[in-house]
Every structure is written in structure tokens, then in C-alpha cells.
Amino acid sequence: MASSKKSKTHKKKKEVKSPIDLPNSKKPTRALSEQPSASETQSVSNKSRKSKFGKRLNFILGAILGICGAFFFAVGDDNAVFDPATLDKFGNMLGSSDLFDDIKGYLSYNVFKDAPFTTDKPSQSPSGNEVQVGLDMYNEGYRSDHPVIMVPGVISSGLESWSFNNCSIPYFRKRLWGSWSMLKAMFLDKQCWLEHLMLDKKTGLDPKGIKLRAAQGFEAADFFITGYWIWSKVIENLAAIGYEPNNMLSASYDWRLSYANLEERDKYFSKLKMFIEYSNIVHKKKVVLISHSMGSQVTYYFFKWVEAEGYGNGGPTWVNDHIEAFINISGSLIGAPKTVAALLSGEMKDTAQLNQFSVYGLEKFFSRSERAMMVRTMGGVSSMLPKGGDVVWGNASWAPDDLNQTNFSNGAIIRYREDIDKDHDEFDIDDALQFLKNVTDDDFKVMLAKNYSHGLAWTEKEVLKNNEMPSKWINPLETSLPYAPDMKIYCVHGVGKPTERGYYYTNNPEGQPVIDSSVNDGTKVENGIVMDDGDGTLPILALGLVCNKVWQTKRFNPANTSITNYEIKHEPAAFDLRGGPRSAEHVDILGHSELNEIILKVSSGHGDSVPNRYISDIQEIINEINLDKPRN
């Protein structure tokens, strides 16, 4: 349902007033923007045909930017601008002129003209449009109130080197993830870069002689590389109503680590607990936690850790005493199908949809096996494997999000055939996880068993038992929310963008499983990828189940903590690489005006004005799932 049109309590001023001009006592009112009804969001798969431009862009963009960065440093011209003539010079680096022509057809040299190749520090000057939500809401009387802590998602936090072994020295205190230094290292010193990014397979910690740590401060996650913003628009809009470093924190972390290792190596959860307690004391206000993607899993784990005896030792009322609200943005609380593909073969939609020349170039530089080998050492990535079994994700003949599909089921996460002449075997999520274990080494299997659980608790007694088991804390289908009747939870995510739901696999000539990109059906399956509605990373099922059903039950929400669900339609601008201010894609939603309105309302103490709103078919989907007994 759509919310009412914006209403304001006073006439809009042309200029932003200062805090002296506008009394804090003024009570603001603001209605969130209207959105189309559910009927306007149908036929998601057909929309994917509107433009082929974006199919390969994300992955190719990373590759071409890296090649440009490597070439720049190789020639040593600090003032180089990548005009077409210059681009032609490094086309040979790809080993295929056809590949380069393919990539070049998508990218203009203007993409690179403002790239600050001599610095890692991005421009931080916000434009008026980027902070308009904050400026308008400041004019309407909204002010900073509760301290705010932001918990970024997977790969969002920059990682910088603190090592002094031979190849590390040139990169000391430079980011090997999340900067132009990363791209330089990837292309000019790939082996050194891999040695830093990969973790020890047995311990899940740093390899000997390597020390890579999460960058700190707002710069850790505001931009990935220059021009590619992540949290910057949220930070800017919060600042517009009075937030600054004394009442706002970006709690960056090393997303490669398992959650137990985050505490063991970095004392991440201990430091997060201390900052929350400090904020309560100094500001005499509870904290608002804002998380995105994997950050929502980290936050949920923190809720269990902080109250547990022998861990955070906060006691059973700590969350209720210290947390005002939890804003869960596009949270991967029950995992994502694309994690299976990333760990199984080092692939996902962006790589599967490259043409043969692009695949050749990518494989020549950074092969599937190398990518899979790297991510399998990262316990944090494995935390996003799907949870809930066939009850949640379905089987070969049924899935809760099949809805009106009659000849095809989303329940087969993997459809696998050894060679082109055979039929595909269909694997549900449990089979797919076993298939993954069959092709990985013992260290990976031990890491999974030690840190994570993927089941579903059927009784309250089972939930209470699981609450005492750290390996279960990652899974909201096996453990419960803390007893926090005063805390409010807001679940916000995008809908209306084709998203990975399953995969067709075959074997390559070396006998390794790879996505079978030859499979297409013209509607739902593209290059071996089964697509469904979602935000481009997480399908609707993963985005909406926990907040709309799991946390609506006493078993998983014993204090009846308030849950507000708000969906935002993905409405990308046609000629904007990031989709523009109406994009609700998994990352781009952080710049969406409606999301920023919600964040400012909640943090300023007006979260009660945020309504529930549904655009997708999530209510129909969750009605197909029975959490009280296993399927026959």
C-alpha cells in the first residue's frame, strides 16, 4: 500500500535555516513519498530485457578500471587522462583485440577523466541533490537525537595493509581492498595481492607475515573507490540534521573473517559494545543501529553475543537498555543463493553473462578457480549461505515463491549435468550445500561446521537451547531476538529488479563445475542463471521472510518487539550508471531518498511515523511457508 503524499507543518523556506533560527521544540511531520501499487511491479523478468547495457557492466567496470589503473602507474604519468587514443594503447594487455573492443563499446573515457590516480582519498564535497532530503527535513524541524552506528555490508569496508614482508612494504597503510591501490596491486602484483586477501585455511585468520585490517572512520565505507559511493549519501544526510563524529560512528570490520574470528582477532564486538555504552552515558540516549546487507547478520549475531554469559556478559536486558532501534537495510539474514555460486565455482551473474572474449580475458587474468579458492578461505562470505532448508527455499517441484509458475520451480537451487548430452539433476538447497562440500577441501568443511548452522528450529524449547550455542547465533531461523520490548526494528529493501535465484551447472574440460551459460529460456533463465524478483542481489524471499513472518511469532520474537516493513520500488534512471536517486538496487538503495527519510526519522526520534508498505508478492510467498512442522 502506498503512503499518503508529503505534508508539512509550515510553509517551505527557500533557504536552510540555522539551528538558532529554527527552535528545536518544533514538531516535524513528513509523509514518505508515494509508490506505485503491487500491480505495477509485475513481470520482473520482462523488464530485464529493456537494456542489455547493464548485464555485464558491473563486472567489466571493475576489470577495465583496474587495467586503466595498472596502465597509468606503469607509464608513470601523474596527469594522464584516458582519452580514446590512450585507451587503445593498453588494449593489447587483454590478449584479445575483440575482447577490448567489446569492453570499450560500453565505456567512455569520460568515466576515468576525474579519477584521482595519485590519491586514495575521494572527493567528499556533497552536491545539493545528494543532501536535499536532509536539508528539507532540517527545515521541517528534524534534529539529531539518538546516537547512530552504521554497520556496513560484505566487501563494503576498506582493508589496508599493516604488513612488512617483502611484497607488502610498498602497500603499507594503503588499501588492498576498496581503493585505486587495490586495482594497482591486482594488476601489477596479483600474487602479492592474493596473498594478502586470502586467509589461512585452517585458522581463518591472517597467513604468516600478513596483516590486513579494516580501515577505520567514515572513510572506511563511504566510497568503495573514487566515484563509487556506498554510505556517503547516508552520512551526508545525517550530517544535514546535526550529526557529526561525536554522535555518529561507522563500525567497519574485516568482512572476510568469520564472526567468531572478528572477536578473537579484532575484538570487534567488544569495541562495539563499549562504544554503545559510552554513547548511552554521554548522550543519555539509546543508540540507533543502521546495518546493510551482511551487516544485518553481524548486528543480529552481536545481539546474541553481547548478552551471553562468557562472551559479552551484558545480561538479558542489555539490548533493551541500550538499543533504541535497528534499521535493517536489505539484510541477508537468511543468506543469498549467489553465495552458493561464488563458493562453488567463483562465478555469479555478472561473470556468466560475459561473452566468450570477455570470459577469455577474465580467465587469463583471474580464473574461476582462483576466485573460488580465495573466497573459500573467507569465513565471513560463507556466513551468507542460504538457511532454512527446503522448508524455506523449496525443492525440485515446489518453492514458496513459485506462485503462478506451473512448469518451473525455483526450489532447485542447482541444476547440474556432467556434460552437454545429459539431463540436469536438480538439487534443492540441502543437496546444493552437500554438493559444495563434495568439491571443497576438509578445511572448508570444518570451518562451516564450526561457525555456522543452516537449519530451522521447530519448537520454543529448541530455540532456547540454540540461544546458548554460538554456532547458531548467525541464524534467525534457529535462535530468537533478544527480549527487547522497547526496541523497534525497521526492515527496508528494494523490489522490482531481476535477481539470482538458481543456477544451471555443468563441468568444464578440467572436470570442474561451472555455470552452464548455454541455457536460456527467453523469460526466466538467462545464461544459466534463474532470475526472480528482488533487489539484484537478494531475492524477495530472502529479503522479506524474517521480518514479515519469522519475527512475527513468539518463538522467534519473545518480547513482541515492534517490526516495521517498508518496500521501495526499483525505478532506475535510463542513462545513469548507478540508476539515479530512485534506484533501489541492493547497494544503490543507500542513496534512495525514501530510505534516507526513514533513517532521519528514526534517528531523530520520529520512527513512529514510518508506515508498513508492501509492493511485492511477499505476503503471498510467506503464506506458502509453514514454520510449525516440516514438509512431507
UniProtKB/Swiss-Prot annotation:
Amino acid composition bias (Polar residues), ranges on this chain: 32-46
Compartments (UniProt record): Endoplasmic reticulum membrane
* SUPFAM superfamilies referenced in this protein's UniProt entry, alphabetically: alpha/beta-Hydrolases (SSF53474)
Q: Which residues lie on this side of the membrane: Cytoplasmic?
A: 1-56
Identify the main location: endoplasmic reticulum
Enzymatic class: transferase
The keyword Iron appears for this protein: no
Chain positions covered by the region annotation Disordered: 1-47
What ranges does the Lumenal topological domain annotation cover? 78-632
Q: What are the record's GO terms for cellular component?
A: cortical endoplasmic reticulum; cytoplasm; endoplasmic reticulum; endoplasmic reticulum membrane; perinuclear endoplasmic reticulum
Annotated membrane topology:
Single-pass type II membrane protein
Summary of the function given for this chain in its UniProt record: Catalyzes triacylglycerol (TAG) formation by an acyl-CoA independent pathway. The enzyme specifically transfers acyl groups from the sn-2 position of a phospholipid to diacylglycerol (DAG), thus forming an sn-1-lysophospholipid. Plays a major role in triacylglycerol formation at log phase. Involved in lipid particle synthesis from the endoplasmic reticulum, promoting localized TAG production at discrete ER subdomains.
Tell me the protein family, please. Belongs to the AB hydrolase superfamily. Lipase family.
Q: What is this protein called?
A: Phospholipid:diacylglycerol acyltransferase
Q: Which organism is it from?
A: Schizosaccharomyces pombe (strain 972 / ATCC 24843) (Fission yeast)
